[in-house]
Amino acid sequence: MNIEFSNIEARVIGCLMEKELTTPDLYPLTLNSLTNACNQKSNRDPVMLLSEAEVLDAVDALIEKRLINDESGFHGRVTKYRHRFCNTEFGNFQFTGQEKGIICCMLLRGAQTPGELRTRSHRLCQFIDVKEVENVLDKLVQDSLVVKLPREAGKRDSRYMHQFSGEVDLAEVPLTVAPVSEVVQGDDRIEQLEKDLSALKNEVSELRYLIEQRL
């Protein structure tokens, strides 16, 4: 795979993919809207505080790589940007809706478990259950687009990470052994409440974004 995003480039592509799916009436995005999306506090890990200049530098680099289109010529005075990373006529990748949702979520939040991906991608795509997420992840792993990370000490599930920022060297993934007293058994009820809270926060953030763009 010839693609290797910087952290900011991954965030930019992830944001364009997300807004394409969640707010299609506001897509493609202006530089200001894209910067706001990159700096969102919800559904982002890590939270960034990028300037428009930093975002524009990443956009210019992605235009050079032919992964973003500058659509200023078609939308009047304001320059707007559209990704061509996947599912375009000349794109290298053609993903299913579920694959696209998972990749987008990983570009925005990094390594995650199948359960986290199911919860956090609910506005991007739909999964019946975690098993369906795992099946899609297995396909992406087979295509060398995603890698399964070693399970962390005290954790029930392994995380998965995209490889669009370079191949993940599993030998360099830190493994820590937690003391027995610190190993907490997963509580399904608490875990579900946490997932529901995360989903609500994402919806509030999207509503706030929509309101800001319409003012």
From Swiss-Prot:
Membrane-crossing residue ranges in chain numbering: none
UniProt-listed InterPro entries: DUF480, WH-like_DNA-bd_sf, WH_DNA-bd_sf
Pfam families (UniProt xref): DUF480
Protein family according to the UniProt entry: Belongs to the UPF0502 family.
HAMAP family the record matches: UPF0502
Protein's UniProt name: UPF0502 protein Ping_1905
Organism: Psychromonas ingrahamii (strain DSM 17664 / CCUG 51855 / 37)
Upper lineage: Bacteria, Pseudomonadati, Pseudomonadota, Gammaproteobacteria, Alteromonadales
